[in-house]
Amino acid sequence: MIRYLKKAIPISILASGMMVSASFADTFTLRVGSGHPSKPTAYVGNMEKVLVPNIKKRVAAETNHKVRIIEAYAGKIAKVHETLEAVEKGLLDIGSYCVCFETAKLLPWNFDYFVPFTTTNLVTNWEVKHKILKQFPELTKMLEDKYNQKFLAMQGFDDYGIGTVKQWQKANELKGVKVIAAGPNLPWVSLFGSIPVTSTLPTMYNDLATGVAKGVIIFPSAHAGGFKFYEQAPYWKVIGFGAMAQTITTINLDTMKKLPPEIVKIIMEE
């Protein structure tokens, strides 16, 4: 929810008539956030360390306005499966989320989970998906028409693999084993004859620690990084499921209408 305060700044005072010419400097408050935590999640970390400071810096340098940004990561305002709706309703002005948790509303955005070919290179995946977004503008338009938000940027995850509690050599050894996945990659679990268990990044560690599942399909930067899945599922194998450009950043359309054009331009460019 955007808030702003106007402050009159005298530009010139004419002694003859004591006339005051004034311009108005507005201070805008923006709520920015994600359901995932910042430190262990690359796309949220970029939001905190790149997007937010760049917006503040450029607005201060290039306009007469100021922005105050309230940052709400790790589900402080919206959980991973609630961020789309939070931006839609204006609870967040700008939000980042994985479309993989929105298969009911954004299934067309998840096409790269279902195509019979892929790439393990995230940059290649990102470039191809951007070309598709340009070729089929219906994908970004559905965000505006149905969910009151505009597409700003797309990020992604590196090549998915599988981490397990016990060591294994052949895929048939995973038959009947409970394996965690999320959203549209749940069908991958069945390829091993395993039992799919639905979870999300913030809850996967505890699910492994408490025995809810004995394996997890995840991208390596999460397995070996700040989420520390390697502590509970130390045996990691590269499967080649592919990298996925699945996380997007959007801005509430009502917020855009209330912001000055020069600030909107900066946000769109960042």
Residue ranges and their predicted role:
Residues 1-11:
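Bacterial N-terminal signal peptides that target proteins for export
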Residues 126-140:
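Signature of the catalytic double-stranded beta-helix
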